[in-house]
Amino acid sequence: MLPIATKSGQCTSFLDALFTATSAVCVTGLVVNDTATYWSLFGQGVILLLIQIGGMGIITIAIAIAVVSGRKIGLMQRSTMQEAISAPTVGGIVRRTQFIIRTTILIEIIGAVLLAPVFCRDFGFWKGIWYSLFHSISAFCNAGFDLIGIRTPFSSLTSYSVQPIVNLVIMMLIIAGGIGFLTWEDIKNHKWHFKKYRMQSKVIFMVTGILIFLPALYFFYFEFSNVPLTERVWVSLFQSVTPRTAGFNTADLTLLSEVGQMLIIMLMLIGGSPGSTAGGMKLSLIHISEPTRPY
């Protein structure tokens, strides 16, 4: 609501400010004002901070602050954290919290570094660095907030629909945030020994692959058949990755058929993985390993 948060120097209405803050901390990505053209650098920074808190989880942030301040973490707090990240046991929660924070920061820095050459070329060095960091955090946290509206308000990433670096990096960040921190723990501990992964991680990889590949095929053959081949490939892949709570888009979704829009809705409903930055019902709920049997 503060004047310093807007480029015009005017106060934002309470409802608009509340909506934006809620959308950011809940990593929803819905906006009533274009993030790039309406909010000042300070306002964008506040939004980014809320996205980061929402992505890692308020409980994770609280435990991290407690650890840094030297406070003892009680059993109730450990149990709450266990539920928040879908950990199998209460033991090792503090260690897992530290792992979550380190992994989040590392992946977001890598994403920003990879995006920097493109954004620095298009927007200048300092603005390019800021845009790279903002979009890296927003993508990893599956938030969907963007600053590309500086070209055309509310346009999301449509101006980068055929830019390979932006497409690849944003998609990988969305997937990285969406598979969950316990899956990243398996990757860290077992590397390429996939058989040693916990069942949840195996299910997540399998269902994630299916939910990217099959929608991409549909979009490629039925929704974007009238665009050039290169753009068709990138747009189809991107639109199969981003609906599961990320919120970016590189195509005008209003031009999709009703079937295509329904597919987008279903992907949004499914969401990401347990203990991830994504929302939705979670991947594990749609996977049935075997039919229920009487005993």
PLM features: residue spans?
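Membrane-proximal intracellular helices of multi-pass ion channels
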Residues: 1-293
